[in-house]
Amino acid sequence: MLTQQQLKQQAADAALEFVEQVAGPDVIIGVGTGSTADLFIDGLARFAGRIRGTVASSERSAQRLASHGLLVLDLNDVQYMPIYVDGADEIDANLHMIKGGGGALTREKIVASVAERFICIADESKLVDRLGAFPLPLEVIPMARAAVARSLAALGGEPRLREGFVTDNGNIILDVHGLSINDAPALEARVNNIPGVVTCGLFSLAGADVALLATQNGIRRLSR
């Protein structure tokens, strides 16, 4: 039986096949953050010199990309990316996701929005019938912490400060437990409209285009 780490590697390798299809001297690849994304980055190293470069969704990923000799570009200098590859903490059959366990949700959402296709890579344990067992992360302006927490409690959630964590943007993370997510796009829009919320970790208004889920029997592919 394959371990979870081996399944993550399988998913990362499957995403590299998409890179192979689009690779070229002018191509820029968007790259996410997290343990599965790290494996994708390590595999992407073989494309150094075959693609123009990358855009990273976090300082952590940028450092790992650079360590492999891959050029890391500022998103402001990029007009087109064919694919963005990232993991998920949860994903459902609609390709809606909860992301942000690593705290990079805002930059992940921004970089993903520029790419033509979002390719989600994960092991099969991340596929759920309904989102919400994994606490929903929110990036929040520090001065708004208490006000945002009250608004989330009114929605039925239990917000908890991620102690000692500061995002790459200088903000805090609230992890919200116990939210009932029956309509992910509606909840995403509602939470994002709370003053002080930079963004929430629901990726449903713009979810993944393709999910590559590693199973004991190979890759299961879901697409829109």
Swiss-Prot record:
Keywords: Isomerase. GO terms for biological process: D-ribose metabolic process; pentose-phosphate shunt, non-oxidative branch. Gene3D superfamilies: 3.30.70.260, 3.40.50.1360. It comes from the Bacteria. Pathway: Carbohydrate degradation; pentose phosphate pathway; D-ribose 5-phosphate from D-ribulose 5-phosphate (non-oxidative stage): step 1/1. Substrate binds at residues 33-36, 86-89, 99-102, 126. InterPro entries: NagB/RpiA_transferase-like, Ribose5P_isomerase_typA_subgr, Ribose5P_isomerase_type_A. The active site is at 108 (proton acceptor). It is an enzyme of class 5 (isomerase). SUPFAM superfamilies: D-ribose-5-phosphate isomerase (RpiA), lid domain (SSF75445), NagB/RpiA/CoA transferase-like (SSF100950). Its EC number is 5.3.1.6. One of its GO terms (cellular component) is cytosol. GO terms for molecular function: ribose-5-phosphate isomerase activity. Disulfide bonds: none annotated. Pfam families: Rib_5-P_isom_A. Transmembrane segments: none annotated. Belongs to the ribose 5-phosphate isomerase family. Homodimer. Catalyzes the reversible conversion of ribose-5-phosphate to ribulose 5-phosphate. This is Ribose-5-phosphate isomerase A. The lineage of its organism: Bacteria, Pseudomonadati, Pseudomonadota, Betaproteobacteria, Burkholderiales.
